[in-house]
Amino acid sequence: MSIPAMPFITGPVAEPQEQLRLSPPRGRLSAIIPLSKVQEVLWVDYLRQPWATHYNLTLKVDLTGSNLSLESIMNNIHKLGSRHDMLRTTFHIDSSAQHTSQSYMAVHDAASSFQNIAIVSDDARLQQALRRGLDLSTEFPVQWIVHQAYSVVDGRLVAAHTVYAMGHHIAVDGTSMSHLSRELVQLIQDGDTTTPPPPPPPSYGEFVQRQAAYLRSPEAQDAEAFWLAQIAHTTPHRWTHAAPLPASAPGHDYRKMDTWAFFPSDELAAWSQLYRTSWFRVAVSVIGLVTAGHARPAPHHDSTLQVAFGARAPSFAGCVSHMANTMPIRQPVSSLLRRSGSATFAELVQLVGKNISQAKKNEMYPFLSLVEAAARDGEDTAAASRVAVTLSPRLADDRCTLYPVNGVWDLFFCFLEHADGGVALGVISDPAVFGPAALAALRADVLRTVALSQQTPDFPLTSALSCLADRQVATLAGGPDVEDVDAVIAARVVSDWIRSRAATQPDEIALSNGEDGTSLTYGALDASSDRKAVHLQRLGAGRNDVVVLQLGAVFDMVAWILAVHKAGACFVVLDRQLPLARKQAILRVADAKLFVSDAFDDAYFADCATPPTTVSVWADTAVPADAHLAPVSGAAPTDLAYLVFTSGSTGLPKAIEVEHQNLSSYVSATRAVVPVGRGSRVLQFAPFAFDASVLEWAVTLSYGGTLCFVQHPALLVGDYLADMVDLNQINFFHTTPSVLATIPDGRRLPSLRALSVGGEASSAGLLDKWSRRLHLIHAYGPTETTVICATEHILPASDTLPSPSNIGRANPHVALLICPEDAETVLGPGVTGEICIAGPQVTRGYRGQPALTAAQFRTMEHNGRVTRMYRSGDRGFIGDDGKLHILGRMNNREIKLRGFRMDLAAIEKSILDNCPEVMTASVQVVDDKLVAFACPATLQGDAIRQRIALDLPSYSVPADITAVDSLPLNTNGKVDHKEVLQQFGASTGPAAAIKPVIVTKTAPKKKELQTSDSNLVDRLEASITTLWQKVLGCRDAPGPDVTFYNAGGHSILLSALHKELVTLYPAAKISLLDVFYNPTIRRQAQRLSELVGDDGFIPSSSVSDVSAQDVATPGNSTTATSVAADAPLFAIVGMAGRFPGADSVEAMWELLMAQRDGITTSDGAGAESADLAEGEVFVPRYGSINGLEDFRASDWNMSDEDAQVLDPQKRMFLMIAEEALQDASIPVRTVSGSNIGTFVGIAPNTYLSSALPSSVSSSAFERRYKAVLDPTASTLTAYKLNLLGPSMDVSAACASSLVAVHQALRALRAGDCAAALVGGVSLAYPQLGGYATSDGKIFSARGQCRPLDAAADGSVPADGVAAVVLKPLVAAQTDGDRVYAVIQGHAIGTDGAVDKIGFTVPSSSGQAKVISAAMADARLARHQGVRYVEMHGSGTSIGDALEYKGIERAVAAYEATGGESRCSSGAISPTGTEQQPSDTKQTPRTLFVGSNKGNFGNAEAASGLFSLIKASLAVSRGVVPPLRQLGDCNELMGVAEGSTVQPLRKQLRLEKGDRVGVTALGYGGVNAHCILASLEAVEERE
């Protein structure tokens, strides 16, 4: 049969200019009922968008042919209104209410209430009536429209009527509309008969009471647990297609319903029978599968669909009301794909059906209660579903049609039952999310999957959609079968698998850094590594040649690693933090051919027999574009892939040689071990010099995931580690037990679904805690066996927790053997011996150390092939279940501590070699730290530590060196290390209690202050020294200039030190980065004194009780504050203005989007009054505004004379200020006044001297001193509107209004006012309709303002007035304000005389300084968070070029320093990290620039606010309007095709997290800059 048409006729509408003010109920009332929980969520939406219609649903009843009169139809409607309370209800909230839960419904008396019925006769009025919003406080929630159509039949005029019931979802649901359809049809059929009415339905108030009782019952608690489980570890759909550009035509936001299919009743019955469940559950499974396929891969998280449940007890069947409950149902597509690549659709239906069955039992639990419960648990996905599904009940007959609500979802699948039992599938999509092509692809996949599901239930999920084919976790693109060991070994180069990934998913992100917003795609990474590989080959790199890499830029490091492999060579990473002696030793052993670095020192190669050729990281730019990568001739699986260096007992570092077959075997084996695939986000935790990094980069990129980096990898412990997991949405990472134990228990880490832990012994408690939260992998593997060779998987559902000694089973093709010491005999289960590992992961041995290789490595036969075996030196046994248990080390003294492998004998040798005064030494592990015991007792521990720190890695330097008289010896006369540990290894016990330095808030005199400051630093040094001793566990106090790491510290202890400092000095808010970047006691004391502030000093008799006084904090904080301190954010909550060509903010936006010109062309009559000089011309073009005559004196309690004297700038601003405050929902002219500051950037008053009639004032005194008596705009506005906060007029030329914003924000930050009204106004008199100019002047002789254009010849003057209302963001959110944008950073400054050839010429360096300061204030680690800058851009060639260069300089300078600012004392206040050169700097994300002066001209003092309002609307609406017109770029700007900064020629779609900058420049050198973000962006950051 043909598919019935299903048009859709409702949609959102633009808000009217006036704001909705809810009214109290009027008239006779029969009941007051509180809102139910299911209504509350819709009420909150309504209060935010009262005029939107996305929650209107409409019932259509076609009465054509019924011969009913209009009067009869209206009477039947009124009968329904009398019968059902909800049809006579209005909705309200008391003005004193503190929460929306205090809202209520007012049921109006039936006898005096009449339904609102509109009678329309044309389609246009019908559409208008159906597309309007409702004032629910004055209108009943269901509006009736009767459409009359007339036709001539047999010479008679016949009327046909169609009835529409348009109801807000807060009052009616689909069941209610179905019931109304039946009652209305029944009334029509009954006609005038006196059929007794049915019994009255139960009251909705009874439902509200029952719901309240239910929510306090044990059943509700069980339901809450079920629903929380449905949303646990889920993620919203993030669609793979690009969002369509916004349409410019009006009405583009109207959604429509497309009918995709019609299913006859017999087809539905067969569908149900095939799966032995309801067809609806099968259909929901189809939708869940297809939408998952069209969303970006999320292998560790399922998604949910919002499914509508009736939630209506049988007794309430006839109650017209809203009871429907739309709840999230988990779609376990990712879970099934993660478990098995052969998962079937039938399995999906079974799981979805089970979820829906349980949901039906718990459908009474309201969605809002779930959101509240989830918020208590820190879960934010409850309301994140982007797809909804509903089944609308059958209507009375085929004359009735139901049009569902739009909702707020990206996709809404509506199954509508027809009278014949068939069901139509209609789909409503958000046109801003799904364009026609994306929707057509989705439709095709839905219908294809439906057809497939009707043929067979057991089809594999991956065969339904091509986009799901590679969604299984851990699949190699074109890789070998993991079971085919020969194919795995022959694969040779892992970089080939990564290249295959680049071919299949070139545009997906390979590398990412959430802190600075940078990323690199697979395609870009592949191309970059190709260029580098070509260069390496041209320099002679080939098979088994060693290439040393020492780089700071992590993206570059990955690219160079791949490049080395593509060139056929072997890489070794040199840690730049190593001491020089260690680097020299490594380079001597490596015998490298090439040394790739971003910094060189000839001293590195002092011990090299043949120094390597040095290669700059920028050298690959010289590679010709047509150069091609040559295949590696004779490549073999046994070629070297990389070297890893570990400590050696002889003092010479051991270089472990890893072959390509070892690497490919390990990466292939991880398919069965590590849950990583497309869409996985993996943290690069380990430094590249350590083999654990191979688990991260090689595995992640081979399997198509995203490798995520951080700015401060050395600080990846505790809260910073948790912050980075959240910021980067990490799904998996590998770490050590010591680091894992530092993550606070309260951190939820919702994105983290799997964790690998290893490198040292774990505790049972740690494994137990984390295995309850996620998939925990207990890993084991010496470096000699390629990263990890055995794992134990502990799932959250595990009944028992394995012993910490249990590290599970071997990787595929790896054999775990237990042998006696120094023998190859294989011991049986349960027998303890040395753990030996055999198989293709066992490496070649130690470079240049054949004797050691022969001692540790053997050759044996395993699985019918000859393979290597490695003797690990670890002691353990294999249990009866085949799992390996590790019990510690054999008799050697090689250990692992905090994941670092070290040889205690090597550390002792370094002490003896570098410190001739030491006779004997023994290094031990005491309380999880290295301690050296040395004799004689006269030794100086600090001196020994300083010397060996030049030879050993920092992690191998003992935290404490204890001098003793002698060390115990064994019978052979050697140091008895076991006896040393027994005699001297007892814990030194806890440090003595640390007393804080108390800082008072008493302000001393200047002389006293200077003395006290010095005393403060000294006393803080003493306090911090004691803290160091406590944290480091050392007896001797470290020197004030010894770094924390050289004193024996490491990242875990640094985190502990930071916690101690925060506990001791909470008001200072010292951050972890503060501690890290100030690594000595002296620097930390200086930094802490700065954070305490200049007004604090230490009294001579310090109090020891920390609770007695608080640490002082300065009231005038400077830019040298800690970035970790909570920087306040500010919201723009109100806006208004008059602009050239636009009388409102909305009209301004429309003009900008349409790229129209708001500048007016006059008749030129003003030339007569222009007083033109020789060479001048009058240009009849001006940016004029409307409304200058709208000011009415009586509205402002002024006489006509007072108004006529008053500067029109101030008249206009009074009106606009009031509009802005009203837009912000702030009451104006209140009796008690409002704590609002007023800050106005205003142009000079030209009205006084040029247009004010002299006869206006009768007072000679006032005429004589009119300039003195002229009121300031800010104070006058504060007086007229009764605003009590600070007031200020700002005169900074074209920067005035943006400088006023800066001053307002400072007042808000200081607490001087609760909100701020900021204005900008410029009106020039006399009003001539044009201006005088001449060639070479700043005003255009052609009357065209063309910013950034080669044809620009100047600006066009304009008038304008604008105002914004600012609040602290926290206050705005608390008050429920609409937030247009958030001001995240701001700064002002002046050029001075820097780089200026004259007063009027701008300075690029001055502008760059202010832009960088604003970025720092916004805490942007790099510029790339800013996507667009709204320039001052006045259309003067030199001015535009200098401003453009200033932006370029700001970007370059900020990138070079990472935003770091240095305090006067030398302590560092970090705002980022120093960035090393990287590929991303060669092709960074483009920063676009533009200017609105091409649309409006230069409104001078108001122009800054023009730009701020434009930018606010851009971040709010997600799109930036382009320049009005742009031909060739201004040549002075030097814009090239690859320039980082580019003019905006077309609309720019902003992504979540993009920031927008705003610049204003004032005559003579005043610079102001703000950085704006959307509310969603800052909420995500928080």
Curated annotation (Swiss-Prot):
Q: Please give the superkingdom of this protein's source.
A: Eukaryota
Gene Ontology terms: cellular component:
cytoplasm
**Broadest EC class assigned to this enzyme:** ligase
Per UniProt, the keywords (alphabetical) are: Ligase, Multifunctional enzyme, Phosphopantetheine, Phosphoprotein, Transferase, Virulence
UniProt lists compositionally biased (Polar residues) regions at: 1462-1485
**Cofactor(s) the record lists:** pantetheine 4'-phosphate
Chain intervals for the UniProt region annotation (Condensation (C) domain):
33-387
Q: Where is the active site?
A: 1294 (for beta-ketoacyl synthase activity), 1432 (for beta-ketoacyl synthase activity), 1498 (for beta-ketoacyl synthase activity)
Which CDD domains would you find in this protein's record?
PKS (cd00833)
Q: What is its EC number?
A: 6.3.2.50
- Note down the stretches annotated as region Adenylation (A) domain: 499-892
- Specify where the region named Disordered lies, as residue ranges: 1460-1485
Q: Where in the numbering of this chain does the Ketosynthase family 3 (KS3) domain appear?
A: 1127-1574
Family matches, as InterPro entries: AA_adenyl_dom, ACP-like_sf, AMP-bd_C_sf, AMP-binding_CS, AMP-dep_synth/lig_dom, ANL_N_sf, CAT-like_dom_sf, Condensatn
The record's PROSITE patterns line, in alphabetical order, gives: AMP_BINDING, KS3_1, KS3_2, THIOLASE_1
Q: Name one GO biological process term.
A: secondary metabolite biosynthetic process
Residues of the Carrier domain: 1015-1092
Any one GO MF term held by the record is: ligase activity
Query: According to its UniProt record, which reaction does this protein catalyse?
Result: acetoacetyl-CoA + L-isoleucine + ATP = tenuazonic acid + AMP + diphosphate + CoA + 2 H(+)
* Family according to the record: In the N-terminal section; belongs to the NRP synthetase family.
Its domain comment says: TAS1 has the following domain architecture: C-A-T-KS. The N-terminal NRPS module contains the condensation (C), adenylation (A), and thiolation (T) domains and catalyzes the formation of the amide linkage between the isoleucine (Ile) with acetoacetyl-CoA. The PKS portion of TAS1 has only a ketosynthase (KS) domain and this domain is indispensable for TAS1 activity by conducting the final cyclization step for tenuazonic acid release.
Q: What does it do?
A: Hybrid PKS-NRPS synthetase that mediates the biosynthesis of the toxin tenuazonic acid (TeA), an inhibitor of protein biosynthesis on ribosomes by suppressing the release of new protein. TAS1 alone is sufficient for TeA synthesis via the condensation of isoleucine (Ile) with acetoacetyl-CoA by the N-terminal NRPS module and subsequent cyclization conducted by the C-terminal KS domain.
What protein name is recorded for this chain? Hybrid PKS-NRPS synthetase TAS1
Q: Which organism is it from?
A: Cordyceps militaris (strain CM01)
Instruction: Show the taxonomic lineage.
Output: Eukaryota, Fungi, Dikarya, Ascomycota, Pezizomycotina
